[in-house]
């Protein structure tokens, strides 16, 4: 389903994981629900539907170094995002990298300058959009980040 409750696609599978590509939800997010069934005497007996799970895409980013300790992160806007949370780590190659929320910016913003990079370390960044669906706010799940060696 789209975030506006329009049915987009139905999948039948015997697998526990399904990967799919629906261009209509690219950069927008979607809702998903599942139910199982068993065959008894060649007749399908269905279980109850799960609750809807709202899936918001993580913002696709690029980073560019602008001076010795500064990088600019740019991202593609996510439809209906109300704000973006920017997270950074100044030593991604450490045994236990420490991520910090460095900024929260509005929906009209598509870039941010991070100026706390440490020379000799690898700075990593990711951006999480927050989208309003109905009366609720949803954030994208953290899936990936980009990093740059600061030399």
Residue ranges and their predicted role:
Residues 20-44, 114-139:
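Beta-strand-rich modules
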Residues 13, 39, 65-66, 107, ...:
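Generic beta-strand structural signal
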Residues 9-11, 30, 48-53, 100-103, ...:
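Short beta-strand segments
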Residues 1-26, 85-119, 132-134:
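Recognizes extended acidic, P/S/T-rich segments that occur
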Residues 12, 68, 72-74, 111, ...:
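Serine/threonine-rich, low-complexity intrinsically disordered segments
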Residues 11, 32, 36, 49, ...:
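Fold-core signature of tandem repeat domains
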Residues 43-80, 136-151:
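Pro/Thr/Ser/Gly-rich low-complexity, intrinsically disordered linker/stalk tracts
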